[in-house]
Amino acid sequence: MNKEQMYAACEFDSEGNLLWAGGTAEKPWIVSTYNAGILNKDWVGGKSAKQADIFRKLNGLDSHMSPKAQEIIDSLKNQPLHVIAENQFAVTDYAYQLFIAPLLPELRKFLDRNILDLQNNESFSTAEKNCQDLIRKVDFSTEFVEAVRVAFEWLDKKNPNVPRAVRSTAPSEDGGEFSGSGKYSTKLRQFGFEEVLNAIKACFVSRFNRGALHYQFSAPHAFGEDLASLSFAVMVQDMQPSIDVAGTIFTADTQSNHPGFVEINFTYGLGEAVVSGRVSSDSWIFAKRPLRLKKDGLIDFKLGEKQEYFDGEWHKNTPENSAKKCMSDETASTLSTIGMLLGDLFRELDVESVESDLEAAINFKTNTIIITQQRAITTLKHEPVHRKFTLDGLNEDGQENATLESTLLLKSKGINAGIPSITHGVVISLFGEGAEFKRDFEKKFNEKKKQITDKYGDKIGVILVTAMTYPWMEPSMEQTVACITTRGGKNDHTPIWCKEHGLPCAVSVKGAPEFLKDGSLITYYGVGDTPAFYEGRHQYSVTETQLEGLKPSPIPIRLIVSDASTARSVCMRSYFPSLNIGRGSGLVRWEMLAAKLRVHPMAVMNHSTLESDFLQLVGQGRMTKEEAVKTAESVAEFIRTEAGELSPVDWYVKALAREIAGIVSPYYTDDINEPMVVRLPDFKTNEHADLLGGRAYEPVEENPMLGDRGAGKYLGAYQKAFLAIDLKALAYVINDMGYTNIHIEVPFVRTPDEMKEVARLVKESGINIPLQMMFELPVNISRATEFFKVSDGGQIGSNDLLQLEFGLDRSGGDILPWHIQHLQSRIENLIQERNTTKPEFHLGLCGNLPSTNPEFAKWLVDAGIDEFSVTPDALIPALLGVIRETPDGKQNITVYTAEGEVFVNGQKA
């Protein structure tokens, strides 16, 4: 084809921008960002279409935008970082189908569903080799090569001599349920026409990777019967010559699936280091609601090891760079805002759009953020099912009994990143790298699995332990009950694949090769943030309650919560507003949040005088001088290390604020606004003394349960000082982070004057929100009218009230039915007094009784309580106790045991 003929098969606009090349305008082989046809994902795949959409909107190429979309674009343009999407052209599915058409008869033979077998990995390896060898032998047509040349020369003229990214994009897999992520080829930093052309061919070849074939074969309802002719496309993008940091932005918390958050995973160099899972990246989580209010939205940060970086080649990172954040919290906040706005934009443009998985990079020299990819998050599900996980020997607070603890192999700093679950299995440990490891992996896996089956039969599954997983491992991963990796993060191949396939997994598990030995039988507890592994086969059960058709509770049933790290997961498992359950919290335990910081607030405030404070204990006979000096220096060093560049007080305030915000943020989002009752610290003196530095400031009491605690403790001379620092943290959460769904609760109020004085201190700290109190002392009941006057609401603390009414040990076994009956009469008296004297006074209850006794929960409703709170595991039993009926008279509860037995509504299935 001569130049005149070649240029006849393309079209440019009046400003010299390529519209299409090759084929025809109706069925082009190549389209550019300046052609609206590139927005057709059936032509170019969702990945390419969405990238082009961002480019067109940021560059003013779309004149027909809704006012909301234009507002979002304007907000993106006003960010501290300049937001761009790189120019690109796309090789369409038309071009791919023309290339593949002559090969289809042979390809269909290789991909015959009568030959492929999900249980036979070798069948997919053979199909991969046969298909790819066939494609490699076929040259591109002259016409196609020239069309690519036209597109490349146009792209290079607009941005000369920069590297290009050549990415596969599969129209059939870029939806909200199925993802082609990681299954096909991506070639980064390609220079010149020949490298780009060869990279396009490599992408075509990768269409038949065995991981992709296995994935498609296992879902015929999505991909059809003919695997040979599935749609496929390739995008060719400009790249920045220099990238400082890169990674992923998810517009939902991927661990809990909560849509109210943005998750950032970034490292030095190109984003391949994060996406592949090869590097443990820095990770930030921001709440969207504060970001929308232009307030501090940072909820959590975890420093990654960042062992290596990738700039086209892999390099070892310096210890200095590994030990520090790859970017500031302020930059991460800007990234989160940009990601949130882009998610808003995609939902505005497509009402069926789900939350977004974005890849981005930053060039600090040009103050530019480059959005390199966007796809749907495929793992977001919120079923009307409540699951309760029970492991023998583990209580509701996550504490192990002696028997279970004796078998603990590893409780890792790694991350549970798959489906929450408990499982047991025999370890298959496979480590290595390079072509030889890839070649032998499947064979070794099958050999080990056969040995396990021969020994244990089919009732014991296998748990894969490896450095990281890849799409080519998927046929083997299909045969596991869990996957454990020593590298990677929450959003690389392992967790994405495991979530899509309903499996638990843990990533970045240090020590796994040492403690999880090949061939050993283990139990994996994959619930919550941190994975735990136990030797042997422990009994467990998973209880599933179907919620569809259940009647709602007549009053709100809220939660008792105390762990910021699991709050988002608890919310997503328990928040069902249509049933009036899981609606915020009637008790957030401050002391458990503060204990995460490990240090007494007075030690933080007195960090410069710790030695003299501890030396006072010498005169009291509580320490030797040597112990006092050594302890003071140890506490001071801890505070210095944790505070870093901040002052100790600023560090403490910010860290405590993050813990509080971590609890309340899941319940204050774009779509959720539920009250969170935060109880001010109720440390007993012995508990407070256990914190670092606490012995210097806490007295030794014979009975801390009845000693210096609650409201009275805040009013001592030095206690007012540390209450001030605690209130400063709370004020930051309310005023600087914007969480106005918080209510404050004061514990252990002995007199109305105590309540008034605490209220004054709270107001002086800049906090102006409702102030409740705990009704947990007998005097709170007998003098209720006086306490109603000094409080904006209250929660009955049934644990302490029961203990103090009868002088009982509330955790002992000597509580009788008569005690409960008397307690009920006291609660009835309080409710009646409220109804008579101050009917608008909101009264709830939190304590063990409704959590452990559904009958008591029902009684509370009948007695006229406004709400009550239970532990998350007790939520559904409490609901069933309250409504007293279920669909068709059945509770619709299924229990799965460790032995593989299934019980439905108490009957063995």
Regions found by a protein language model. Give the residues of each.
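N-terminal beta-alpha lobe that positions the nucleotide/phosphoryl donor
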Residues: 1-235, 244, 323-330, 335, ...
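Conserved phosphate/anionic-ligand binding catalytic regions in large, soluble enzymes, centered on
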Residues: 17-48, 53, 67-68, 77-99, ...
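Acidic, glycine-rich flexible loop/linker segments
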Residues: 1, 13, 103, 107, ...
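Conserved catalytic alpha/beta cores of large enzymes that bind or transform nucleotide phosphates
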Residues: 262-365, 461, 612-669, 733
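Beta-sheet entry/capping signal
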Residues: 82-90, 163-164, 233, 247, ...
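Conserved alpha/beta-domain cores
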Residues: 172-180, 243, 339, 550-909
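Generic beta-strand/beta-sheet core signal
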Residues: 86, 92, 167-169, 237, ...
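Extended active-site and interfacial segments that coordinate phosphate-rich ligands
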Residues: 181-214, 242-312, 371-413, 480-486, ...
